[in-house]
Swiss-Prot record:
GO cellular component: cytosol
Lineage: Archaea, Methanobacteriati, Methanobacteriota, Thermococci, Thermococcales
Name of this chain's protein: Translation initiation factor 2 subunit gamma
Pfam families: eIF2_C, GTP_EFTU, GTP_EFTU_D2
Organism expressing this protein natively: Pyrococcus horikoshii (strain ATCC 700860 / DSM 12428 / JCM 9974 / NBRC 100139 / OT-3)
Region feature (G3): 90-93
Reactions catalysed, as given in the entry: GTP + H2O = GDP + phosphate + H(+)
Sequence segments annotated as region (G1): 18-25
Gene Ontology biological-process entries: formation of translation preinitiation complex
Class of this enzyme: hydrolase
UniProt-listed PROSITE patterns: G_TR_2 (PS51722)
Binding site for Zn(2+): 61, 64, 73, 76
Keywords: GTP-binding, Hydrolase, Initiation factor, Magnesium, Metal-binding, Nucleotide-binding, Protein biosynthesis, Zinc
Length: 411
């Protein structure tokens, strides 16, 4: 067992989504043993700001047949058998962090929508996160009705009916609703079995050219490190197709900004992979699933503080095109999501500035042209994306960016 565990990488990414304080991080801890809020400001404010990843092994007990994430069955004490390793993406539920949640959503193969039983459903971010899943086309959804320890049976049933009503007509209409207490670990086995039943590992072709979406980037050198001990910049993200190997030459697009004739342009860069980390282990090869850390020969100055977030990594010459402007086939929602009162979505106007999320990248787009169900936008920061990719569209309403629909990239 120990040997297999060493080389094991998560094979599926599952998003934890839902309203702030409904228990996403607590549930991630119940499933993985890892508290994903490790950013100092997060611990102080008690909310998730950056996206957290934590892996768990799904295991089944051959004796009683129940599922858990522990090597010894918590129900009968028998040794459990490994089924697969999954990675949980803990996405921020706070409204100001919605664009971060969208970046994480682009890496999800399925999602657990956490809804607290002790509050009326839906709350603004519950609605907003479900809309985000709808926009990225995510259908593999489980609903965890959390905090049932705080309500009586009547209240829990009333909340269940509200959830049923809320998901009617959405991608989550047929999602199982599982009552749990993340705090006390109650019914977690039922939730783990639902993950097995409703969130399959996607079929992937390892021979496709590799493509990794960058979510974070770091300078891992401590201040005062002597020059000969400095290591190159590290990129953190998720491989969405193909595989990466230590020693591979990689290209990063759109790359790094430089100034030319008073305009900011971007230049793709190439470098070499010197190390790979997956599931907390150094590995020689990394595949889709989980968060992968890619050690490079890049100057760490380029990667510090998430500067490379939103880039795409692949083999030189094999990456999708970089776009300075996009033509989008637009699908607007009827109502703005995330606001306390429901507002109608007004049509997009020429010269309007929109916030666009493409994969893990986010950029501003100035609307230069309008057609029937189509817009053209000039991008502030170029993006690397395929024709046919989905783009989440947000508009500034009051002081916040609000999700108003999505676009599909046209040639």
């Amino acid at each position: 067992m120990g040997e297999r565990r060493k080389t094991r990488q998560a094979e599926v990414n599952i998003g934890m989504v839902g309203h702030v304080d409904h228990g996403k991080t607590t549930l991630t801890k119940a499933l993985t043993g890892v508290w994903t809020d490790t950013h100092s400001e997060e611990l102080r404010r008690g909310i998730t700001i950056k996206i957290g990843f934590a892996d768990a092994e799904i295991r089944r007990c051959p004796n009683c047949g129940r599922y858990s994430t522990s090597p010894v069955c918590p129900y009968c004490g028998h040794e459990t058998e490994f089924v697969r390793r999954v990675s949980f993406i803990d996405a921020p539920g706070h409204e100001a962090l919605m664009t971060t949640m969208l970046a994480g959503a682009s890496l999800m193969d399925g999602a657990i929508l956490v809804i607290a039983a002790n509050e009326p459903c839906p709350r603004p971010q519950t609605r907003e996160h479900l809309m985000a899943l709808q926009i990225i086309g995510q259908k593999n959804i489980i609903i965890a009705q959390n905090k049932i320890e705080l309500v009586d049976k009547e209240k829990a049933l009333e909340n269940y009916r509200q959830i049923k009503e809320f998901i009617k007509g959405t991608v989550a209409e047929n999602a199982p609703i599982i009552p749990i207490s993340a705090l006390h670990g109650a019914n977690i086995d039922v939730l783990v079995k639902a993950i097995e039943d409703f969130i399959p590992t996607p079929k992937r072709d390892p021979n496709k050219p590799p493509k990794m979406l960058v979510l974070r980037s770091f300078d891992v050198n401590k201040p005062g490190t002597p020059p000969e001990k400095l290591v190159g910049g590290v990129l953190g993200g998720s491989i969405v197709q193909g595989k990466l190997k230590v020693g591979d030459e990689i290209e990063i697009r759109p790359g790094i900004p430089y100034e030319e004739h008073g305009r900011i342009r971007y230049e793709p860069i190439t470098t070499e992979i010197v190390s790979l980390q997956a599931g907390g282990q150094f590995v020689e090869e990394a595949y889709p699933g989980g968060l992968v850390g890619v050690g490079t020969k890049l100057d760490p100055y380029l990667t510090k503080g998430d500067l490379m977030a939103g880039n795409v990594v692949g083999k030189p010459g094999k990456l999708p095109p970089v776009w300075d402007s996009l033509r989008l086939e637009v699908h607007l929602l009827e109502r703005v999501v995330g606001t306390e009162q429901e507002l109608r979505v007004e049509p997009i106007k020429r010269k309007e500035v929109l916030l666009l999320n493409v994969g893990t990248a986010r950029t501003m787009g100035l609307v230069t042209n309008l057609g029937k169900d189509e817009i053209e936008v000039k991008l502030q920061i170029p993006v690397c994306a395929e024709p046919g990719d989905r783009v989440a569209i947000s508009r500034q309403i009051g002081s916040r960016w609000r999700l108003i629909g999505y676009g599909i990239i046209k040639e």
